[in-house]
């Protein structure tokens, strides 16, 4: 092989981009795991302690005390009902927190559902196995009331936006008093919006306020709303307290379509529209 070609290949190989492993993205819903089964290697492409699996290879490692339990209403031994998705949920029977380590890290956000009889917490760490700096810590207050046959019947959503890559998340609480439902890793936090007009129809020259009310799963939305009238941008307004509004008095007679689109770094984009009638 000519020396010039060898040099070319060497340079080509030298500057090949390094392929990094993709960050973890998926839903840990505990489906296919059995009643009182330890999660073990199920979400690392392996099996649970009772042989369930192989599960999806999310590169997740769980501490040895992480178990799943099925509702008694479905033939298991769990004292709960109404869990989102109807799959088994995660719990622990020892005083140590349950920690889930993501080998490839998690970006964007973590959001999950929980049910608690006593106060618990969720702490997100930069490193594996609950090490490194704390990126976020959320209190999980008791949320069950009005339950009859089952002690746990209310499930609350909690979302944690991430400004840096997370290495692990730890769930702590009183044993047998905290249950964790589906855990969403690395995906944008779902949002919804309602767009309203202060006066519709209105009179030409009358000030009309358009209000976009934005809600997000398990947390307050952070971002801005872009308002358009007849396809033209009329303002970009930051969301405060879940609300962004803009006031116009210059709309022409007739019907004008008003559009509002919410955008946030770790939130899903959502848009709504209405037709404003001016007499």
Regions flagged by a language model, labelled:
Residues 1-8:
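Bacterial N-terminal signal peptides that target proteins for export
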Residues 10-17:
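Bacterial N-terminal signal peptides
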Residues 18-22:
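Sec/Tat signal peptide C-region and signal peptidase I cleavage site
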Residues 23-188:
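Surface-exposed, well-ordered secondary-structure segments
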Residues 188-279:
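Solvent-exposed beta-strand/loop surfaces, strongest in extracytoplasmic domains of secreted
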Residues 17, 97, 155, 166-168, ...:
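A generic structural signal for beta-strand entry/edge sites
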């Amino acid at each position: 092989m000519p020396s010039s070609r060898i040099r070319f290949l060497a340079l080509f190989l030298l500057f090949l981009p390094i392929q990094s492993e993709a960050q973890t993205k998926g839903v840990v819903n505990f489906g296919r795991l059995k009643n009182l089964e330890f999660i073990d290697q199920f979400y690392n492409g392996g099996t649970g302690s009772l042989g369930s699996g192989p599960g999806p290879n999310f590169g997740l490692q769980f501490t040895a005390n992480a178990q799943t339990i099925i509702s008694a209403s479905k033939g298991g031994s769990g004292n709960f009902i109404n869990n989102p998705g109807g799959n088994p949920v995660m719990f622990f029977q020892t005083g140590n927190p349950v920690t889930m380590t993501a080998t490839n890290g998690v970006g964007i956000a973590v959001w999950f559902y929980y049910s608690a009889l006593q106060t618990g917490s969720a702490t997100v760490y930069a490193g594996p196995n609950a090490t490194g700096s704390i990126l976020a810590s959320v209190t999980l207050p008791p949320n069950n009331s009005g339950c009859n046959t089952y002690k746990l019947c209310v499930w609350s959503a909690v979302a944690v936006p991430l400004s840096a890559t997370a290495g692990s998340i730890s769930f702590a609480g009183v044993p047998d008093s905290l249950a964790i439902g589906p855990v969403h890793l690395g995906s944008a936090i779902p949002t919804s919006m309602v767009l309203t007009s202060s006066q519709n129809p209105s009179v030409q020259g009358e000030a009309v306020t358009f209000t976009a009310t934005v809600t997000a799963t398990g947390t307050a939305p952070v971002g801005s709303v872009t308002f358009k009238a007849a396809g033209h941008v009329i303002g970009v307004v930051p969301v405060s307290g879940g609300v962004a509004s803009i006031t116009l008095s210059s709309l022409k007679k007739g019907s004008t379509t008003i559009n509002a689109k919410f955008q946030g770094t770790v939130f899903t984009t959502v848009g709504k529209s209405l037709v404003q009638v001016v007499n």
